[in-house]
Amino acid sequence: MKFDGLICGDSDLLLKEMLDQNISVDLILTDPPYNLNKDFGNDSDKLSLDDFLLITKKRIDLCKNLLKDDGSIIWFGIHHYIGFIQSIMYEAGLNYRRMNIWYYENGFCRTQKAPLTQYEPFLWFSKSNKKWTYNVDDVRIPYKSTDRLKNPIYYKNSKGEKVKWEPNPLGAMRGDVWAFPTLAGKVFKDERTEHPTQKPESLITEIIKAYCPKSDKGFYEGTILDPFHGSGTLGVCCEKLNSQGHKIKWIGIELEKKWCDVAKDRLDKILTLV
């Protein structure tokens, strides 16, 4: 089998086949089922805790072995289980880099007996403890204020010299809280599908920009794998970037034909515009 683009099938079997073919990837960016009884067309989100953790461990072990030596995993989760998943990553021999937070901006709550849910965590682990990709300048954000320009701040550099702080022309460094709205409301009607946990393209594109390797000329050119491709957001984002001159190879594996069809339809619309 050729592993390139959208593939409809069981990620457990297909990840093993990728290993048999000696395929390796630079980045694994995935949003697997959270085991919250969502309807994905099968029982993958309705498991006992033990079964959920066992399946998660198997997938993470396979993913680790598919990573290049300087590769990274970005794994979305939910606050219920993210601690378990983080422990599984440690046990697999992966190296913790950061727990990032996707801050919804437009969260919701189904109960009056708990705080409003406004975030989902996503873990970043690297295969190596010495080398990984993080494109800091590609994901800078606007400064919140200009107070530092009005009231200059001085600091001592590595030589002990007093230096005036100057703003980076590209913006402030991104923190570990990533603020992007969910796909709610009319403004997102063209992007939104029926998939119950679809992530916004704006968020996934920003993550790709942060963690995908680049060529000497500044183009993204790594190989990205999503073993739980869902409605196809990763593929759509990669193809939109490729239409700008980047050369990202992506592999999206999805079990359910319904979501494969949705992903294919979204991709077809993008590719006809290229």
Region locations from a protein language model:
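Positively charged, low-complexity nucleic-acid-binding target-recognition regions
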Residues: K269-V274
